[in-house]
Amino acid sequence: FLQTKPGLVGNFTYGKYTKSSLNFGGYNMEFYTKAVDNKVVASYGETLGTALDFYTKKFGDSNSGKKIIVAQIDDESLDFYSTQGMIFMATRLLEQPREITEERLQREAAYQWWGLTVGLKSFDDVWLSQGLAEYSAVTLRESTTDAAKLEDLRRSEGVIVDEVGARTRLARQSTTPGGAPVPLKIGDTLELND
């Protein structure tokens, strides 16, 4: 392996895999899986390819180039892990496809830019890459959602758009003692509690 630009330490996985190659939006994606339904691989490939294409158009090329590898790992590890040009996914995510997994895959794709292409000065800056990756994924979902569903998406994502178009991600909207959401207005100051 040769890496000519500074970056985080890479990783590898070893096992008996089935290789599935997909092309989407100019990206060559290789999925290395163990006994996973081809429809799931195709669906995740489309999700990943759409995300990579969107981020490339929005932010320019990432250091990982036009090839990305997705490798299945065991459930005893993390759900996802991203390194330059590679995304690791836990087995359960490939065996039980859900919408939330596709949303997280969009975020993992964004790490090819935030934290890997745009590096971190120190470990204390990790929150920046996490926030920018989440922002990128929400922006992608907003761009592919019709107006009727956009408000629901913003509420479920906890995103409020102010009058100048700046986006602020909230952990969760506050609720009244009865459980009803507290109405928020542009310019409100929010206190987020753990």
Which residues does each PLM region occupy?
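Structured beta-strand-rich cores of soluble
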Residues: 1-26
